[in-house]
Swiss-Prot record:
InterPro entries cross-referenced by the UniProt entry: 6-PGluconate_DH-like_C_sf, 6PGD_dom2, NAD(P)-bd_dom_sf, Opine/Lysopine_DH, Opine_DH
Keywords linked to the UniProt accession: Plasmid
Name recorded for this polypeptide: Uncharacterized protein y4xO
Gene3D superfamilies (UniProt xref): N-(1-d-carboxylethyl)-l-norvaline Dehydrogenase, domain 2, NAD(P)-binding Rossmann-like Domain
Pfam families tied to this protein: Octopine_DH (PF02317)
GO molecular function: oxidoreductase activity
Length: 379
């Protein structure tokens, strides 16, 4: 079985090392980094992953490079780990090199921001492509040294995937067999891809905290940070409360989707419940969203995206962060669009989205161009 991983970032690196612990899996990594590719080509391409208990797992992927034809040759599965804003260009780049003589299972980890719609649009006419996505990353990964080492944080107890509505039961069965072969945690199949699209995650979490840190009336609205801080260990009370409001609105979108489409999306649970089920005893105090975020050991030490203040002392939020370009420009934009079409009211999400677009000034704004124009009517 050959797995091609697109992206040599934290998730791509960690998955490559973990997959190669299984001798029956051929792993190729397609990267845009000429440095990482050259290091592998020189023979010095041993990748490492440091586990939470201090063990070091090592592996050398079978291919690491910038050539999509080499990376995708005879691939059975393609895992896309790039952020949402990079996925359209990537799919266009790899499309000509996908095998045509067998089924190819193309999935995104995680599969949020409407990946099923994006992939179906870019890869239209390719009947052998099976589109799927994973609800969340299987593990937290951080402290990446590109092409060398990454640290592995908390792991999900169970993994959940969904396929595009067009896919067959036979394709679903084949996908599940493949995923349960390459992942240690049990993999479960969801009924509808909207269960992934509406999973409460980064599109709710990071923007809510950003707004509470630097939005209107926030402590750092008009001054830089004195020191680095962590997304979750240092999450302010206001951020947790705003996140709860956004999560309630996401549930309203879920209920409206169920009513309009006649489907069951009950697996889309409130965020606090999702986190408790995902991280269990790694959470020190799960009584409130605030205490949960600050005491989840799987989240400990994850830094907020701060960079040196170009206008003086201190630190400021990095405008190049995925929190803006992925979670807001794609994740929140999609939720706002879905809410409008479903006539669901989402004042907190819309408030953050409008503020972030104004604050940043250079975000892709409006409905992502791959959302079907006739959704939800034609769904």
């Amino acid at each position: 079985m050959k797995v091609t991983i697109c992206g040599a970032g934290r998730t791509g690196h960690l998955n490559a090392v973990l997959f190669k612990q299984n001798p029956g899996i051929d792993v190729s990594v397609l990267t845009t980094s000429a440095t990482v590719a050259a290091r592998w080509a020189s023979g010095d391409g041993l990748w490492q992953a440091v586990t939470r208990d201090g063990r070091t797992l090592s592996a050398r992927p079978d291919y690491i490079g910038t050539d999509p034809s080499a990376a995708l040759d005879n691939a059975d599965m393609v895992l896309i780990t790039q952020p949402a804003q990079a996925r359209s260009a990537l799919l266009h780049r790899i499309a000509p090199y996908l095998p045509t003589d067998k089924s190819v299972y193309i999935g995104a980890i995680p599969g949020f921001c409407g990946f099923d719609w994006l992939a179906a649009k870019v890869l239209s006419g390719r009947d052998n492509v099976v589109i799927w996505g994973m609800k969340d990353v299987p593990h937290i990964a951080y402290d990446l040294i590109a092409g060398q080492r990454v640290r592995m944080g908390g792991a999900k107890a169970e993994l959940f995937v969904a396929l595009h509505r067009r896919e067959s039961a036979a394709s679903a069965a084949a996908l599940m067999a493949m995923l349960n072969h390459i992942y240690e945690a049990p993999v479960n199949l969801l009924k509808d891809y909207l269960e992934i699209t509406l999973t409460p995650g980064n599109a709710l979490m990071h923007p809510a905290v950003l707004y509470a840190l630097i939005g209107p009336g926030a402590p750092w609205e008009k001054r830089p940070f004195d020191e680095a801080l962590c997304w979750w260990s240092d999450c302010p009370q206001a951020g947790a409360e705003l996140l709860e409001a956004c999560d309630a609105e996401n549930q309203a979108i879920r209920r409206a989707s169920e009513a309009r489409l006649g489907i069951d999306l009950s697996s889309v649970k409130p965020l606090q419940q999702e986190l408790i089920e995902a991280y269990g005893d790694q959470i020190g105090d799960d009584r409130t969203m605030y205490t949960l975020l600050r005491t989840n050991r799987a989240y400990a030490g994850i830094p907020a995206p701060l960079v040196p203040n170009p206008h003086g002392p201190g630190l400021v939020i990095d405008r190049g962060s995925r929190a803006f370009h992925e979670d807001i420009a794609f994740g929140q934009a999609l939720l706002v669009t879905m809410a409008e079409r479903l006539e669901a009211t989402v004042p907190a999400i819309a408030k953050i989205y409008r503020w972030a677009c104004d604050y940043h000034g250079k975000l892709a704004a409006g409905t992502p161009d791959y959302v079907p124009a006739d959704w939800p009517e034609a769904a």
